[in-house]
Amino acid sequence: NNFQMWDYITVDLTDVLSKNFNIDMARQSIMGHSMGGHGALTIGMGMPGRFKSISALAPICNPTGADWGRKQLAAYLGDDEQNWVKHDSSILMLNEGFDGKVLIDIGSKDQFIDLLRPETLASAMTERRQSGEFRIQSGYDHSYFFVSTFVDDHVAFHADLLNNE
């Protein structure tokens, strides 16, 4: 019952925002960092037509392809690996793609890069010919400094797309 992040982001938070702020709910984008980046990617691709753009900073890209990710997916979703597919952004990108633009940033010195598996998402984006950018930022790790350095780019990316809608 607790920690239903998909519903929190797509229903609860959206309801609060739409009821309390003058927001055009027809123009939405989604972004996140690390596990939140993974969530942004899977939610964005899992809800075609809802989001105009997705961006992620150092996202988990292929949890089904790493032992630690498989352990987490099994704990949350059970042992049936078919249930895991909709929670793997690389597989979703390859199979479904996204109907808007995508921006991904990851640091070349990210200490978790082997667990994040960004090459799988980059490959899926290339194979799918996904509209967007996948950027490797030289010298950056997974830290707050990385996020604070590039988050403005992500906000501008979304603002440009939403304002030119």
Role assignments for model-derived ranges:
Residues 1-165:
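Non-catalytic cap/lid and distal C-terminal segments of serine-dependent acyl enzymes
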